Amino acid sequence: MLVILGGLPGTGKTTIAREFARALEAIHIRIDTIEQAIRNSSLAPAEVNEAGYLVAFALAEDNLRLGRTVIADSVNPIELTRAAWREVANRAGTSFTEVELICSDIEEHRRRVETRAADIDGFKLPTWEEVVARDYEPWTEDHVVVDTAALTPDQALANLCAIFSSPHEGEGGTRAEGIGGEGRL
């Protein structure tokens, strides 16, 4: 199974993805780590976004074909990349679930962005102004929405684990709908 995780910087993606990967004994593939490794290489292209996603797609597909669950951790700002992740799952013959993390409390979101520290050597975190100005297309496919403003990381993790342990999860590439019938946690 592929968990396609996305959301703006500062919504808690990596914090939740790491713990979710531990809980599911899954592979955690983080775009920021891949892109920074490319930047650090002697062959670093000026624009690493495409290369980072292509590497992540390949790593995810390899692991999915081994029967592993993969958590894909990226901003995933446009439908093009979301569709590409879905295609990775389809090629590997496995199910996928799309999960968007949001932080509906603007002040809390800003506080997180402005106070967090990078955990990847050389990685430059975006400023609040860069987060707000970022192109981010609305999600159009069925997906789970996790509002991290209203949940602690442990609560978000517990809710995700409950969804992924439900009997309907992962049937034929369907997406989970979340709690409350609206796909929102």
Residue ranges of each PLM-predicted region?
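Conserved phosphate-donor/acceptor-positioning beta-strand/loop module used by diverse small-molecule
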Residues: 92-112, 146
